[in-house]
């Protein structure tokens, strides 16, 4: 699963997901892409599940690019813990995704294969997405 090698600070604020994605909203590497239509946190497990599903579906040939990276730590407190005594410890990593952001890209395969593989990956995502073709 994806996670940063090291970060400057161990814990982060939750933040807000306002507006649309200004970066990573165009197809850069492949010919087909999966684009987010809603804002969300996508965990490293979800990213990996989608990537594996796509890889398994295209088998040999074809290349997949993951355009998002989970660089935000999410902290959780132990269950049945009283209030206070600081922020919880980092448990998992998420990528902050805004509408318009490309999540995966794919190239080197036929359109019908790409559409099938990307739709399987889309079902692993917690948000509505759309399939995009570079014309």
From Swiss-Prot:
GO terms for biological process: mitochondrial translation. It holds the Pfam family Ribosomal_L16. It is found in: Plastid, Chloroplast. It comes from Populus alba (White poplar). PROSITE patterns: RIBOSOMAL_L16_1 (PS00586), RIBOSOMAL_L16_2 (PS00701). Its main location: plastid. PANTHER family: 50S/60S RIBOSOMAL PROTEIN L16, LARGE RIBOSOMAL SUBUNIT PROTEIN UL16M. Signal peptide: none annotated. One of its GO terms (molecular function) is structural constituent of ribosome. Gene3D superfamilies: Ribosomal protein L10e/L16. SUPFAM superfamilies: Ribosomal protein L16p/L10e. This is Large ribosomal subunit protein uL16c. Belongs to the universal ribosomal protein uL16 family. Keywords: Chloroplast, Plastid, Ribonucleoprotein, Ribosomal protein. HAMAP family: Ribosomal_uL16. GO terms for cellular component: chloroplast; mitochondrial large ribosomal subunit. Part of the 50S ribosomal subunit.
